[in-house]
Amino acid sequence: MQAVERPVQTTDSLVDTTIHRRKTRAVKVGNVTIGSDYPVVVQSMINEDTLDIEGSVAAIRRLHEIGCEIVRVTVPSMAHARSLAQIKAKLAETYQAVPIVADVHHNGMKIALEVAKHVDKVRINPGLYVFEQASGDRTGYTEAEFAAIGEKIRETLEPLVVSLRDQGKAMRIGVNHGSLAERMLFTYGDTPEGMVESALEFIRICQSLDFHNLIISMKASRVPVMLAAYRLMAKRMDELGMDYPLHLGVTEAGDGEYGRIKSTAGIGTLLAEGIGDTIRVSLTEAPEKEIPVCYSILQALGLRKTMVEYVACPSCGRTLFNLEEVLHKVREATNHLTGLDIAVMGCIVNGPGEMADADYGYVGKTPGVISLYRGREEIRKVPEAQGVEELINLIKADGRWVDPPQ
């Protein structure tokens, strides 16, 4: 394969506000397509034991209904693998088809082969797929030993690859920084290089079997490691002429505000660089709470628009009304108008200029009076008490209002 040319940074590229995504192939996962010609896809994972058919179906449906486009389930045993057939059938019968990914770990060759019959994508971890017996007194691997284990991996992986290839299904090669195989640790260290080489070993096996429905992930719990691993993976794939999509995530990000910030620091940084085709925010919370974070990251970067974009200034001494309270009222009245940009600005000093890209603006004019804008044009001045109502009337007059869902 020929190397993929990466654009050289120039002055023009430094001031370019468009995110140029790394060119990747289209990989279908059920009825969803992942790749650079498609929107960045949002994923999550249910907490339920997949032996609980009803509970798993309900959990998958809950996630899908709030925007999770691909749902992953854990498959630790053959019994769990077989239950996926019932879960898929029950979803189709009572709801609709949802793309399902099976997560296979720990010497899971037979499990992966069984579950491949029932799901749309199988995720394997190169560090755990073939068990390597750790040796306490080992100090390294010879080339022959390294190659011998590589051949064992090929023998074990080939039936799964052939099954997925022949069914037109997908595989995620999901490397985790915390579970690199022993020989990778001895050879490359606990490094992004070791993560990349671990993925490349599996990719090459798949390519040799003419299987290319691959998605790659390089997850770590520390953001700097995760960033380095994905950047290096993208660089190496480009050099090798590989165009496989990347699944982004910071594993074990934690919960609350910091978990969200940590995930955004990793995922958002790479997306801004054009790296990444599907994302999962991993929080130690209910899976449903991951989905809004994903869509907020994508909206903030302009990669997907699934909600109203609110522009609002911080409060300062010039603010002519209670900005926080008014923003809350405006948001409450308009947050269903997906696709609009609405600005709420406290005064006319910076307001009109900083909200110029918004569709509509609500700007403090004088004490007790606000101005309503359509784009850069001031439409009317109204008493503050009528501001939100008149903003709605303006949107209605322009034919851009829809009633909120009941």
Curated annotation (Swiss-Prot):
- Kindly list the cofactors needed: [4Fe-4S] cluster
Please list the reactions this protein catalyses: (2E)-4-hydroxy-3-methylbut-2-enyl diphosphate + 2 oxidized [2Fe-2S]-[ferredoxin] + H2O = 2-C-methyl-D-erythritol 2,4-cyclic diphosphate + 2 reduced [2Fe-2S]-[ferredoxin] + H(+)
What is one Gene Ontology biological process annotated in the Swiss-Prot or TrEMBL record? terpenoid biosynthetic process
Q: Entry cofactor note text?
A: Binds 1 [4Fe-4S] cluster.
Q: Does the keyword Iron apply?
A: yes
Q: Which UniProt keywords apply?
A: 4Fe-4S, Iron, Iron-sulfur, Isoprene biosynthesis, Metal-binding, Oxidoreductase
Signal in keyword set? no
InterPro entries the UniProt entry points to: Dihydropteroate_synth-like_sf (IPR011005), IspG_bac (IPR016425), IspG_bac-typ (IPR004588), NO2/SO3_Rdtase_4Fe4S_sf (IPR045854)
On the tree of life, the source organism's domain of life is Bacteria
By sequence similarity, the record places it as follows: Belongs to the IspG family.
Its biological purpose is as follows: Converts 2C-methyl-D-erythritol 2,4-cyclodiphosphate (ME-2,4cPP) into 1-hydroxy-2-methyl-2-(E)-butenyl 4-diphosphate.
- What is the protein name for this chain? 4-hydroxy-3-methylbut-2-en-1-yl diphosphate synthase (ferredoxin)
Q: Which organism is it from?
A: Picosynechococcus sp. (strain ATCC 27264 / PCC 7002 / PR-6)
